[in-house]
Amino acid sequence: MGGISIWQLLIIVAIIVLLFGTKKLRTLGTDLGESVKGFKKAMNEDEPKDAEFKSLNKDESATAGSEKVKDKEQA
């Protein structure tokens, strides 16, 4: 009733293909896909940096614990 049927969607797609042509739509899809891949790659590159900080924090806590033991031994 108020929604768009499959036939209406097919007509809209056919009009878009006629207006822009398949070659232009293909290049547009390729450009869009490459930009999404680049965005995902940039998001994945940020994650290991966070992991490095977490590992540094663990190392610092281990050295802080050993320093406390040394302080107790000296006292």
From Swiss-Prot:
Signal peptide: none annotated. GO terms for cellular component: TAT protein transport complex. The keyword Transport applies. The keyword DNA repair does not apply. It holds the Pfam family TatA_B_E. It is found in: Cell inner membrane. Keywords: Cell inner membrane, Cell membrane, Membrane, Protein transport, Translocation, Transmembrane, Transmembrane helix, Transport. One of its GO terms (biological process) is protein transport by the Tat complex. It comes from the Bacteria. Residues 50-75 are annotated as: Disordered. One of its GO terms (molecular function) is protein transmembrane transporter activity. InterPro entries: TatA/B/E (IPR003369), TatA/E (IPR006312). The chain crosses the membrane at residues 1-21. It is a single-pass membrane protein. Belongs to the TatA/E family. PANTHER family: SEC-INDEPENDENT PROTEIN TRANSLOCASE PROTEIN TATA. HAMAP family: TatA_E. Part of the twin-arginine translocation (Tat) system that transports large folded proteins containing a characteristic twin-arginine motif in their signal peptide across membranes. TatA could form the protein-conducting channel of the Tat system. The Tat system comprises two distinct complexes: a TatABC complex, containing multiple copies of TatA, TatB and TatC subunits, and a separate TatA complex, containing only TatA subunits. Substrates initially bind to the TatABC complex, which probably triggers association of the separate TatA complex to form the active translocon. This is Sec-independent protein translocase protein TatA.
